[in-house]
Curated annotation (Swiss-Prot):
Protein name according to UniProt: Acetate kinase
Protein's cellular compartments: Cytoplasm
High-level lineage: Bacteria, Bacillati, Mycoplasmatota, Mollicutes, Acholeplasmatales
Encoding gene per record: ackA
PANTHER family (UniProt xref): ACETATE KINASE, ACETATE KINASE-RELATED
InterPro entries, per the entry: Ac/propionate_kinase (IPR004372), Aliphatic_acid_kin_short-chain (IPR000890), Aliphatic_acid_kinase_CS (IPR023865), ATPase_NBD (IPR043129)
Keyword Nucleotide-binding: yes
Binding locations of substrate: R89
Quaternary structure and interacting proteins, as annotated: Homodimer.
Residue positions of the active site: D146
NCBIfam families, per the entry: ackA (TIGR00016)
Cofactor comment: Mg(2+). Can also accept Mn(2+).
Molecular function terms from GO: acetate kinase activity; ATP binding; magnesium ion binding
Cofactor names: Mg(2+); Mn(2+)
Catalytic activity: acetate + ATP = acetyl phosphate + ADP
Amino acid sequence: MKILSVNAGSSSLKFQLLQMPEEFEIASGLVERIGNKNAEFKIKFNGSSKTQSDLVVLDHSVAVDLVIKGLLENKVIASLDEIQGVGHRVVQGGQLFKESVVIDDDVVIKIASLNDLAPLHNPANIIGINAFRKAISNVIHVAVFDTTFHQTMPEENFLYGTPYEWYTKHGVRKYGFHGTSHQYVSELAHARLGKDHSRIIVAHIGNGASITAVRDGKSIDTSMGLTPLEGFPTGTRSGNVDPAIFQLMQQKEGYSLEKTLNELNKNSGYLGISGVSHDSRDIIAAAEGGNKRAQLALDIQAKRIVDYIASYYVLLGGLDALVFTAGIGENAKEVRKLICDRLGVLGIKLDDNKNNSRGDKEISSDASNVKIWVIPTNEEVMIARDVLRLQNK
């Protein structure tokens, strides 16, 4: 059966059409710059790709129409009847959703009630859900939450040292994100280890990034928190800072709470430290060219990532595998080396020659006590698996 996996962002819409249960990609694509008159639509199928530029795509419903039209006009499908399920990535499930769910009107209302916890993401996810439910109305639609995989964290790992009533009244706690990716990659790593019990750390490093400790297939701690801002510096996010920074910036610069939060979310990390770019490729190139602030941005991130890995090593009582995934984790050998070279005291040792090659591979040296792998993530497959599972229930 054909299942469509959808990831709706605030200004983008990613999709992948999969043949299930074979997990074969039939087509994939992306609509970028939604809300503008210069949007772009890309679709890949049968080994070829097509791009349409300078499109007027004022909202997500137009983007959905583009996707459906692209699938039909390129004869990827003969009719919409071939699509037998749609899976939707939803960033924040809060404490309302402990697992993936079949979407109905009540589920949409509950997802919307969590918008305060993910104001940049959940509203866009809902727009995508509503647009696809209207366009393809006669099939199962499933919400798959970034937070679900982390529901196995114990209280001591997900609660903050804030007044307990904040948690009971407002749900103030660590939720974690990228759960779909962490689950997919850790399941593969567990299978490769061939052990009943495993201790795995997954480093999902992209423009957004997080680290997760996984014991026997279950998340027991993760670096992102109430929102994706917690953790280590990424493309534009600061990661952990002293909350008193909000008062300081109000006193020194007259910044409102919203202004400082925006600076921490959109003008920090690689971009804020280097002054060059949010893109790791630009940062690495600038650092290699002698830009000290670009190198500093890489060093600060690597140091904070190592802090998490070392902490989770202790939490897990040792480590069987360290896995790198996502855009930077899979492709930036320089970032992997910066991290692994700081972990030698834990018996984690990189093979530089293996690290210089691309693709799904082991990059640990023969002397390493821990397996180091690069495993490409595939969140769309995980989403499609849940659609198939719930349809067969």
